[in-house]
């Protein structure tokens, strides 16, 4: 079994976070790869985006490491949904490299995000997920999230439209 360490991301992690975001978001052969196109932002722009997120703390980024290798990350902060109360947090993104799935890294990232949101005074948390991403749905439901059926919506992602739904839970 691998040793899993989570820690706040540093600027040096921006490249790894960008690589994970581009690679883990669309692993070949998954339902997500069938509905989600490759990210419109190229790698260089992804790296700049994540470097700025890490530098300015919006969202807060934690990474999961196997020894010295960054294998996953979570971005979390206050909820961005219009009209949400200040006590509502949000998982903005959570990704683990496919080679590290089912080894506890996703759970460790969720634990780090939950602890961070509690420190910020949040009492609830939400996450938006593509309906077709059965693996992510299952992960979040096992972590105690419940679907909000009335929240289902279609959003543009690159050149396609993706059906997504919000899940929530108490912290």
Segments (PLM) and residue ranges:
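Conserved catalytic-core motifs of GNAT/GCN5-like acyltransferases
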Residues: 126-129, 141, 146-163
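Active-site acidic-Proline motif in GNAT/NAT acetyltransferases
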Residues: 97-99, 103, 131-132
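Short glycine-rich hinge loops at helix-strand junctions in the catalytic core
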Residues: 104, 121, 144
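Helix-turn-helix
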Residues: 136
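Conserved GNAT acetyl-CoA-binding A-motif
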Residues: 117-129
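Acetyl-CoA-dependent GNAT
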Residues: 4, 8-14, 18-99, 107-112, ...
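Terminal substrate-recognition subdomain of acyl/acetyltransferases
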Residues: 2, 161-171
């Amino acid at each position: 079994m691998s040793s899993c360490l989570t820690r706040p991301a540093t600027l040096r992690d921006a490249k790894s976070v960008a690589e994970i975001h581009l690679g883990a978001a669309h692993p070949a052969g998954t339902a997500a790869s069938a509905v989600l196109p490759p990210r419109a932002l190229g790698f260089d722009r992804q790296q700049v985006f994540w470097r700025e997120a890490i530098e300015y703390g919006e969202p807060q980024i934690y990474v999961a490491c196997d020894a010295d290798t960054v294998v996953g990350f979570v971005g979390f902060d206050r909820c961005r949904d219009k009209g949400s109360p200040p006590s509502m947090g949000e998982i903005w993104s959570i990704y683990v490299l496919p080679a590290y799935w089912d080894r506890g890294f996703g759970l460790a990232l969720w634990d780090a995000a939950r602890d961070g949101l509690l420190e910020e005074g949040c009492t609830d948390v939400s996450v938006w997920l593509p309906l077709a991403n059965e693996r992510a749905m299952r992960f979040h439901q096992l972590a105690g999230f419940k679907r909000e059926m009335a929240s289902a919506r279609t959003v543009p992602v690159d050149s396609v439209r993706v059906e997504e739904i919000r899940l929530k839970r108490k912290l």
